From Swiss-Prot:
This is Cation channel sperm-associated protein 1. Pfam families: Ion_trans (PF00520). PANTHER family: CATION CHANNEL SPERM-ASSOCIATED PROTEIN 1 (PTHR47193:SF1). The chain crosses the membrane at residues 448-469, 479-500, 509-531, 541-563, 582-604, 646-671. Signal peptide: none annotated. The lineage of its organism: Eukaryota, Metazoa, Chordata, Craniata, Vertebrata. It comes from Homo sapiens (Human). Keywords: Calcium, Calcium channel, Calcium transport, Cell membrane, Cell projection, Cilium, Developmental protein, Differentiation, Flagellum, Ion channel, Ion transport, Membrane, Spermatogenesis, Transmembrane, Transmembrane helix, Transport, Voltage-gated channel. Testis-specific.
């Protein structure tokens, strides 16, 4: 073991120098403390046999031979061990879309307890060994659990592994040892909680670099990966992916089982300088924060790394699925052109002593990290562009909507303004019309207008009477025609004024209907005279004109209408109106009796007196004339001459029923109605007279009080006292009180007397009714 270790150390140093020269231009000067050679890798991606894209090695021949010899003895066991014990779960294949020979990147979960114990024993055995030849099949499983516990790795080591086409499911874990040279190692790599996210892009936002000094443990950088998304896309910082990495717009970023946002890894490589790179947005479970996983401070002191590493996996299962990414360049171009894979990996923890095998895997991870970062960045750039377009379109639509809304509001305001203007005009016009109608109503109801119309009606009546004389009509024909036209115009104006003032209620009055009919007849007469002035000698037209002229006699009735303001006339007309139902009933009885007697007389005396009893109508007319008691003796004598002497008892019965009963009933109803109306009128007049007298007395007393002391406002009692003093002179207070009490008693006595009188009147009526009923009973 010791003999083999010497050449192996030399070989490793040579490989380290080669790798240093190979990546010198892409890394920033590290800040490293010797002796702190353990890096914590909480959820590291395990490259299960990912071959190189072109199937060739990038290592020197010596390193390639050495790696092939070391791998040949354990490749089968390593493959088998990683297949059987890779976290106790199947690794989900993940394609990066590079080449068909690309392997699968598994998703990691927490270890089982039994597997943890076995790996802990294996880790102790490998941790104590310092030879490179200590590589055996259990070391592969260390790589699955956390492939670089306490060691840096040489970049470019495992390229020969990928070129050989052997599916390497893990590499040996080298914990300390003679192959870890002391000093700054710019190509050591440390992995975060989830190496599966693989540094989705390079961000150049230098403001996000937090300068965290190395305090004893170079890899304890207090890197807090917060659960919220702090994704800073590359285009937001004004920079793009390096060295021709093509971003596929159709690539998709890996999604989490719990949908947690990407966290932003903040780090610092010693001093703050522009060449530092962020590790992008690492998709990570929010419970796997470095705040919660700082337990690695306690078990990175050259102790059992595997047992302590198991505790960091207890935070929860991490299931990851990666997305397809198409990048046209080979892994060689990604390694040589991308300036940040090694430097970006070294930015998480301090640089440690180099290890030749870890660098190759780290380079492959760096390339996959760049691809994943480019995929995520391209998708987010594309998503942001789409969202920007959508926001612009939405802004345009919003602007158009606001314009349409503004136009609608303006139109609505215009309509509302026009509506308000129309409403205001309508209200104004209605107010003017109402005022005009009120003025016309006051005019038509005024005494002057009534007097003028009454004078016109009287003059028209006198003119109609004068036209009955032939000599006056012939001499004053022209004057009569002129006056008739003037009267006609006055009647038309009166009707129009009343229709305007009263509206349709004008036709609800009988007198108004009579006036309107007379006015209509006058209009027809005037029109016929004007249109047929040359056909005046036509017989039919002449008769029509005579009819209209005779109807002008109805204007005399207007005199009675103008006399309606007289109280007596109003009482008579009111009484007739109230007695009409009773009169109508009596008239129906009279007509029934007349019809019965007509039928009997026609059947009996049709042959004896055919002139009077020929048919039912002539018989009714004959009986109606008998109501006047005219010529009833002639009817009897003619019938007796023809042998119908028995007509006399029938005529007597008819005259008694019709004349003495029914006609007297009509007169009785009218008289009773008139008496009732007169009594009510008298009572009403008496009450009105008493009310007027009382109001007059009260007004006189108030006038005297106001005239005496106009400025003094006295109460009701004071006013009464003053009134008493004026009537009875000066009195003492005791006398005033006694007088006031006396007046109250007198008033109460008068009230009681009034009640007594009313009760006595009721008793008198009852007694009278009783005596009348007794007399009727006695007579019966």
């Amino acid at each position: 073991m010791d003999q083999n270790s010497v050449p192996e150390k030399a070989q490793n140093e040579a490989d380290t120098n080669n790798a240093d020269r190979f990546f010198r231009s892409h890394s920033s000067p590290p800040h490293h403390r010797p002796g702190h050679s353990r890096a914590l890798h909480h959820y590291e991606l395990h490259h299960h046999g990912v071959p190189h894209q072109r199937g060739e090695s990038h290592h020197p021949p010596e390193f390639q031979d050495f790696h092939d010899q070391a791998l040949s003895s354990h490749v089968h066991q390593s493959h088998h061990h990683s297949e059987a014990r890779n976290h106790g779960r199947a690794h989900g294949p993940t394609g990066f879309g590079l080449a068909p020979s690309q392997g699968a990147v598994p998703s990691h979960r927490s270890y089982g307890e039994d597997y943890h114990d076995e790996l802990q024993r294996d880790g102790r055995r490998h941790h104590d060994g310092s030879q490179y030849g200590g590589f055996h099949q259990q070391s592969d499983s260390h790589y699955h659990r956390g492939s670089h516990h306490g060691r840096p790795q040489y970049l470019g080591e495992n390229l020969s592994h990928y070129s050989s086409g052997v599916p390497h499911h893990g590499e040996a874990s080298h914990h300390g040892g003679s192959y870890l040279p002391h000093g700054p190692n710019p190509y050591s790599e440390s992995f975060h909680h989830s190496e599966a996210s693989h540094l989705s892009g390079l961000q150049h936002d230098e403001s996000q670099h937090h300068q965290v000094p190395h305090r004893g443990w170079p890899h304890h950088h207090q890197v807090h990966h917060h659960g919220r998304s702090r994704h800073h896309e590359a285009h937001q910082h004004g920079k793009s992916p390096h060295h021709g990495e093509t971003i596929s717009p159709h690539s998709s970023v890996g999604s989490y089982q719990r949908g947690i946002s990407d966290y932003h890894s903040e780090y610092h490589q010693g001093d703050h300088h522009p060449s530092e790179y962020h590790h992008g947005d690492h998709p990570h479970h929010t419970q796997h924060h470095y705040h919660q996983t700082h337990r690695h401070r306690d078990y990175h002191q050259h102790q059992d790394h595997h047992g302590a590493y198991h505790s960091s996996y207890l935070h929860g299962d991490y299931v990851q699925s990666t997305s397809q990414l198409s990048i046209p360049h080979t892994s060689r171009s990604l390694i040589h052109d991308a300036p940040g894979p090694a430097a970006s990996r070294t930015g998480v923890f301090p640089y440690h002593v180099a290890h030749p095998r870890g660098s190759a895997h780290s380079m492959t991870r760096s390339s996959s990290t760049i691809r994943s970062r480019v995929t995520q960045m391209s998708k987010k750039v594309h998503t942001q562009d789409i969202s920007t377009k959508h926001s612009e379109d939405w802004g345009k639509e919003e602007g158009q909507f606001q314009k349409r809304k503004t136009g609608r509001l303006q139109r609505t305001r215009k309509k509302g303004h026009s509506t308000n203007l129309f409403q205001w005009l309508w209200e104004k016009l209605t107010f003017l019309i109402q005022g005009f109608r009120e003025m016309i109503r006051n005019l038509t109801q005024s005494l002057a207008f009534e007097t003028f119309i009454f004078f016109v009606v009287c003059l028209n009546t006198v003119m109609l009477v004068a036209q009955t004389f032939a000599e006056v009509e012939i001499r004053g024909e022209w004057y009569f025609m002129a006056l008739d036209s003037i009267f006609f115009c006055i009647y038309v104006v009166e009707a129009l004024l009343k229709i305007i003032a009263l509206g349709l209620s004008y036709f609800f009055d009988f007198w108004n209907n009579l006036d309107f009919f007379i006015m209509a007849m006058a209009v027809l007469d005037f029109l016929l005279m004007q249109t047929h002035s040359f056909a005046i000698y036509h017989q039919s037209l002449f008769r029509i004109l005579k009819v209209f002229k005779s109807l002008r006699a109805l204007r005399a009735i207007r005199v009675l209408r103008r006399l309606s303001f007289l109280t007596s006339v109003q009482e008579v007309t009111g009484t007739l109106g109230q007695s009409l139902p009773s009169i109508a009933a009596i008239l129906i009885l009279m007509f029934t009796c007349l019809f019965l007697f007509s039928a009997v007389l026609r059947a009996l005396f049709r042959k004896s007196d055919p002139k009077r009893f020929q048919n039912i109508f002539t018989t009714i007319f004959t009986l109606f004339t008998l109501l006047t008691l005219d010529d009833w003796s002639l009817i009897y004598m003619d019938s007796r001459a023809q042998g119908a002497w028995y007509i006399i008892p029938i005529l007597v019965i008819y005259i008694i029923i019709q004349y003495f009963i029914f006609l007297n009933l009509v007169i009785t109803v009218l008289v009773d109605s008139f008496q009732t109306a007169l009594f009510k009128g008298l009572e009403k007049a008496k009450q009105e007279r008493a009310a007027r007298i009382q109001e007059k007395l009260l007004e006189d007393s108030l006038t005297e009080l106001r005239a005496a002391e106009p400025k003094e406002v006295a109460s009701e009692g004071t006013m009464l006292k003053r009134l008493i003093e004026k009537k009875f002179g000066t009195m003492t207070e005791k006398q005033q009180e006694l007088l006031f009490h006396y007046l109250q008693l007198v008033a109460s006595v008068e009230q009681e007397q009034q009640k007594f009188r009313s009760q006595a009147a009721v008793i008198d009526e009852i007694v009278d009714t009783t005596f009348e009923a007794g007399e009727e009973d006695f007579r019966n």
